[in-house]
Amino acid sequence: MKTKTYERLTSLHDKYGPQEFGKLCQKFLAITFQMAGYSRIVERGVQGVDIDAAGESGEKYAIEVKTTVTKSINFEKKDVEGLQKRKQDGYQPVLAVLRLDRFSDWIFARAQEIKPGSLYIDSLRVHRLRELEAGTRPLFDEAIGNHFHRTMQEAQRYLDNFLRQKGVEVRRL
């Protein structure tokens, strides 16, 4: 990620804390997929798979989003089960991990190849979906740049409203 993106994400993390930060990043990722041209996106602020994204050319991703400031994440059994359910509908299960670090970017990993538990982030590299990462990386930076200031003021409410305006289905409690 660009240095400016890192600085903005750090500001969001400092203001809102790790749990809310994770939800904000999930919404930024949904915006990123919308910018990438995915036509059918569902973003869930409730239990279950975090994001479904389907493209015009038939690609379908069910995405479990994890954010951290450490070198590992917890990939729970419930995450695996939720992704498996979406796989039955033709979605490719993806584990998306963002470590808030100066030189980090999203890692998109083929989740069906990963066992639940505490996972060292670097261990996910062998499972990466490099094309998906490359196609979304610059758009994530752009999404942060476009929506940072309003998100600092209004957090999830602003991002939810923006996503709905763009035709994304937002599911909340």
Regions found by a protein language model. Give the residues of each.
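Acidic-basic catalytic patches of nuclease active cores, encompassing PD-(D/E)XK
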Residues: M1-E43
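Conserved catalytic cores of phosphodiester-cleaving nucleases, focusing on short active-site segments
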Residues: F33, I51-A53, S57-V69
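Non-catalytic C-terminal interaction segments of nucleic acid-processing enzymes
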Residues: T32-M35, Q112-L173
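Beta-rich catalytic cores
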Residues: Q47
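Catalytic cores of nucleic-acid endonucleases
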Residues: R8-Y16, E20, V42, K60, ...
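Alpha-helix C-cap/termination motif
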Residues: A36, A54, R86-G90
